[in-house]
Amino acid sequence: MLPAHKQTLEALLADSVKQVAHALKGADAAFVAPAITLERPKVAAHGDVACNVAMQLAKPLGTNPRQLAEQIVAALTAQPAAQGLVEAAEIAGPGFINLRLSAAAKQAVIAAVFDQGRAFGTSDREKGKQVLLEFVSANPTGPLHVGHGRQAALGDVLANVIASQGYAVHREFYYNDAGVQIGNLAISTQARARGLKPGDAGWPEAAYNGEYIADIARDYLNGETVAASDGEPVKGTGDVEDLDAIRKFAVTYLRREQDMDLQAFGVKFDQYYLESSLYSEGRVEKTVDALVKAGMTYEQDGALWLRTTDEGDDKDRVMRKSDGTYTYFVPDVAYHVTKWERGFTKVINIQGSDHHGTIARVRAGLQGLHIGIPKGYPDYVLHKMVTVMRDGQEVKISKRAGSYVTVRDLIEWSGGAAAGQEAAPDLIDEATITRGRDAVRFFLISRKADTEFVFDIDLALKQNDENPVYYVQYAHARICSVLNELKSRYNVDVAQLPGADLSQLTSAQATSLMQKLAEYPDMLTHAANELAPHAVAFYLRDLAGEFHSFYNAERVLVDDAAPRNARAALLAATRQVLENGLAMLGVSAPAKM
């Protein structure tokens, strides 16, 4: 049901309830009606929408719920505005009100899609509000792995979905460029620069073994210049003894590589925030001092502890170890203070499920500061791991990273790049990257975040209905082909279709397809409210299925203009919604396949 129709029907039902309540209790009686909730019945035979308001009000009004439902329906159907919207109403079970919409109400979605085009499904209900969405936030110690890819897909699609409701969305990447891992990166690069490789005597135990380290060392020795998208260029000095210069070069090199990974994946950020800046600007010390002054800490065994149990944690946590270094959640607290100070009252973090333990600590630290941050800030979406399969076997390593599969590997393999071709990226064309990006983005968003995901490369390469992204894209391409044929055979352009006689669309398949189109706006609202971007992929697969059912049941290109143009109008509206949904996922909508 279209949102406008839903709002109208809710208002009509609320007015009907008020009329009945006044008739039963008197116009002056105190009465608070519950909010009207409309749901689509699970069984199509039960109508298009169902409402349980009679069951909610029977006791307060002192009447039988089924009799009350009959009175509400009588009041509803007597209203002129309802007569063009509701075709039939019936009472089911103990008092459910089941309504069947008129054919015109169902067909109205086609005109709405034509009128709104790419904006169909979007809303401005949250206009003026802003959201900070933090995702990926990888250490700059190697290429992005498939877990980062899942975060990138979840974050980018969720940002699109939230923006569709009118929010101004700020995409942020938090670089963990301070700590032990960065030191390990520096000594790894230094060892490679000295001619060592994994397994050699003198190779550091904590070093990274991927071939990308050798690439960094080579460019450092050659005096190459590298730059991340938001930073100053850094030139390799070639000095193998200058560990600080090596560290700066290696971090910038890998930030540039991660930028390239994200570019290949079609993901852009509004801001990159460096963990190191929290230290250089004194924000970590300031946060710790504020918690000490607030009485949220205590000293024990030479360490500084945070009273996280005050906020529901199972035990208190160390903030500053006996050696004077901070535990990893302390800069996270300082970082989230900056989010609050920048005016972001709604913040969503997308992280791996292994970060679950840090949630209570960060929230406890923020509450302990007593600066007005609400409980439950920030929101979190936690995702589980991704397993990559190829030829029936799990893929655990790649030439790029040595110990894990990278996002770029996954994109190139899913686009059809041959095994080993990733070592020669110049041989991989843009079409391969586009196919791969589409497959990876769609696949990684096609399951709920809190479920483990098996990414099957062989399935991503299939060009049949088993491959969900192919299935949806093929529906779009097939409609484009039909509309092109409509133009060439009958000289009917898509621009003429809004004038079609939609009363021709009465079949069960046409009705089901129109109802699915009308669900798109509510689906987006639900996905935004529940932080559930997978709902878009679920919807698109269902919509493609409804299209195929309709197309297989009814011929579109017939000589009789009335049914032909009506069916073509339905296809054109379906094509637009498929395009809109694919754009929400950051996936292309090809006109030919």
Swiss-Prot record:
One of its GO terms (molecular function) is arginine-tRNA ligase activity. It is an enzyme of class 6 (ligase). A motif ('HIGH' region) lies at residues 138-148. It comes from the Bacteria. The keyword tRNA processing does not apply. Its EC number is 6.1.1.19. SMART domains: Arg_tRNA_synt_N, DALR_1. Keywords: Aminoacyl-tRNA synthetase, ATP-binding, Cytoplasm, Ligase, Nucleotide-binding, Protein biosynthesis. GO terms for cellular component: cytoplasm. It catalyses: tRNA(Arg) + L-arginine + ATP = L-arginyl-tRNA(Arg) + AMP + diphosphate. The keyword ATP-binding applies. Belongs to the class-I aminoacyl-tRNA synthetase family. This is Arginine--tRNA ligase. It comes from Burkholderia cenocepacia (strain ATCC BAA-245 / DSM 16553 / LMG 16656 / NCTC 13227 / J2315 / CF5610) (Burkholderia cepacia (strain J2315)). The gene is argS.
